[in-house]
Structures are given as structure tokens and as C-alpha cells.
């Protein structure tokens, strides 16, 4: 089972090709299955099909039922309106996403093209994780600095 967020997880369907969990979201049908509770389904631009085609997976929360994340660049977007075009919004908020820059479907990529694309995806994931660890470290460092300054102030009194 592949975890997208604390809320959404993906189970493999019988007809889905066997592949590592990391690669399953390249498959349009896998992304589309995450939109089972999507609030916009008819008479709008941001249908589940168009959202999945734009690379998004649906990862709702109690407070934000329309949160989506690009499986590739990891950009999260919410506050969707019925007239919002998923591909246009994706390009506007994450213009450097290589997935939306593809000129063909992921299923049509050569092995070499796919592996190069996936290498970039892994770099993005690692950078995001590294940034998260840096933020946590800086928060702890600031907390410790505050304690040290308090100790110093107590000693000088």
C-alpha cells in the first residue's frame, strides 16, 4: 500500500500492472482512484479525470476537502473553483514541474526517459525531506538558544 498523506492511501487493483509503489502514481488510473470523494464532478473544469491527468492526487482533510498534490513536484493546491482548469493551475503554481512539461503520456515514455524523469522526482522528494529536517533542526536550535540565554540571564543576576 502506498501512502500519499495521513488521509489517503492507495491499494493496488487486480488489473493494475505490478510495479514498485513509487512508480504507481505515474499511472493515470491510480491517481484517478484518489478522487472518489472529490467535490467537483460534473459541469465544471476540474473533474476528477482532468485533475488526475494534470498529475494530481486527492488528499483531503477535515478542514480542506479539496486539497490535491502533484505526485511529481509535490505542490499542494486547494481552494478550487468549478471553472479552474487543473493543468493551467498546475502550470501557474509550479511552472518547473517536469511531469506537466511532458509531451506524451507517462505510459508512452521509453525506459531511459522514464528513469531520467523518475530521477528528478526522487531529487524533489529528497529536497523536500531535507528542507523539513532543516526546519525542525532550526526550530530546536532556537529553542535551545532560548534556554541558554535564560540560563545566562539567571547566572548574571
Swiss-Prot record:
Single annotated GO MF: metal ion binding
Summary of the tissues where the protein is detected: Exhibits strong and homogeneous expression in developing oocytes. In embryos, expressed in the animal hemisphere from one-cell to yolk plug stages, and highly expressed in the future brain and dorsal region of the neural tube at the neurula stage and early tail-bud stage. At tadpole stages, expression is restricted at a low level to the head region.
Subcellular location: Cytoplasm; Nucleus; Chromosome, Centromere; Cytoplasm, Cytoskeleton, Spindle
Residue numbers binding Zn(2+): 70, 73, 90, 97
BIR repeats by residue range: 31-101
Residue list for modification Phosphothreonine: 47
GO biological process: one example: vasculature development
Keyword entries, A-Z: Cell cycle, Cell division, Centromere, Chromosome, Chromosome partition, Cytoplasm, Cytoskeleton, Metal-binding, Mitosis, Nucleus, Phosphoprotein, Ubl conjugation, Zinc
Pfam families: BIR (PF00653)
GO CC, any one term: spindle midzone
Post-translational modifications reported in the UniProt record: Ubiquitination is required for centrosome-targeting.
Main location: cytoplasm
Record's function text: Does not appear to exhibit anti-apoptotic activity. Plays a role in increasing blood vessel size during development. Component of the chromosomal passenger complex (CPC), a complex that acts as a key regulator of mitosis. The CPC complex has essential functions at the centromere in ensuring correct chromosome alignment and segregation and is required for chromatin-induced microtubule stabilization and spindle assembly.
Quaternary context: Component of the CPC at least composed of survivin/birc5, incenp, cdca8/borealin and/or cdca9/dasra-A, and aurkb/aurora-B. Interacts directly with incenp (via N-terminus). Interacts with rxra; the interaction is stronger in the absence of 9-cis retinoic acids.
PANTHER family for this protein: BACULOVIRAL IAP REPEAT-CONTAINING PROTEIN 5, DETERIN
Notes concerning its domains: The BIR2 domain is required for vascular development.
Family the entry assigns: Belongs to the IAP family.
Protein name as annotated: Baculoviral IAP repeat-containing protein 5.2-B
